[in-house]
Amino acid sequence: MLGAIIGDIAGSKYEFNNTFDYDFEMFGEGCDFTDDTICTVAIADAILNGRSYQESLLDWCRRYPSPKGAYGGRFAGWIRSLNPQPYNSFGNGSAMRVSPVAWLFDDLSQVLEEAEKTALPTHNHPEGIKGAKAVAHAIWHFRKSRFSEESKECKDKNSKESDDKAMKAFKDIARSYYEDFDTRDYPKGRFDETCMDAVPLSFYLLSQASSFEDAIRLAISHGGDSDTIGAIVGSIAEARFGIPQDMKEKAISYLPDDMKDVLKQFAENAK
């Protein structure tokens, strides 16, 4: 989940002021965590402490009512409501907050079931649910590819062969959710907050990356909804590449103590 947080913080200052410079300042003045981080922490907290996803999302978002970049209009109304109900959203919010599920559950069927549950309080449209499941599936795939005994043996023999095999399987996953993954256009700078755009775009950017930092730089410099694209790409890149220690430490320095506590608990319980 820290990959999502890093992508969110790195992209936060560029969400409404896009950069197309690959060498942008990663953690510069004006960067901060946004709703993407708050909601990701909320999902982790729910799983770790036996809370419902809705209860945890409401708690954390009410605890931090005015994050950098603000909450989306309908989501903000949902937070303030005395009787919050799902509003059939297919926005990218379901995809950006789902990453803890892929680390805290081990069986794919359970990962996908829980991913759907994380979307339902707000993003109960089929595309909102699909976006959450697709991202969780991708993270789970790379987590298993990196840490399985078979993968370790294969990497010892031929690292490139192992990586190529994992990437081929990832692209198959992408196509299983988005049939036109290989043929659609991914123009720079298009601001589209739907799962139908953000998730395949994030998969495409991840497929071009050679390291965690490269993935984040490709995501942010593509423009558009920079913090959320950064969060989705970062969440998958963490599972594929791991995260450099200096980037971990820098991102954590932006977080308040209650979020750090959840991160610590998450690290102790991740599969």
Residue ranges and their predicted role:
Residues 1-271:
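Structured, active/binding-site neighborhoods that engage oxygen-rich ligands
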